[in-house]
Amino acid sequence: GYNQYGELGTGDTEERKIFTQVKGPNGEGILENIVQITTGYYTGYALTTNGEVYGWGSNRYGELGQGSKSDDPVLYPTKMKKVSNIIQISSGAEYIVMLDAEGKVWGTGYNGNGQLGIGNTTLQTLPQQMTSISGIKEISAKSNNTYMLTEGGYVEGVGYNYYSQLGDGSSTDRTTAVYTKNTSNKYVSDAKHISAGENSVFISRKKDSEGNPQGMYVIGRNDYGQLFTGNTTRAYYATEVEKEKDILTMALTEGQTGL
């Protein structure tokens, strides 16, 4: 694929028409012992078995977490500074968020909509801990939004909110995390998994007390009917859909959804 910014991690900026292995740090060998990967606009990231994060490609906004930013691409995987014991990674457009084993969330890179959740819109070149949150067990980022699922089944969101995709009933960007509400204006508290889309989010629900499926919640942009609501109206709050189904996996992209 496209490789102008070295986002394929092959040590150069030449496009590839067949799969090519990502090189190791400093171009030595290949990148190994990987348990998860994620990609930004022009950046690749990998999480290792020992909780380290490596990034390569564009570092224009400090999204590689090296303490600096540059228009020059980083051609080989480089270890993210300041973080350890990471168990999940998720990247937005030009930033990344990372969940550690203690339930804390860290982020670095572009922050123009507050998507790093640190109370401001200043870009960061080193990972910073998200403020006012704890007990997080799952994260999902897309474009300029970050979502967190708590151990208790609550959902929090931060960042861009023009399409009301944070589910707090407003269209105001948030620089600190807010709880997602349902159409009864109560906090969502039965979430099982989360998946961020382009200005929307899907939340699969736990089964009820009798073991019955409850489907999922959808929030945000709906120009193309991607929220399964049968219309193209924006969802300001978490809206119930597919209620009789037990949703196992969700995949979202711009204007399209798969379950």
Task: Locate each region found by the language model.
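Eukaryote-biased RCC1-like beta-propeller repeat architecture
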Residues: 1-259
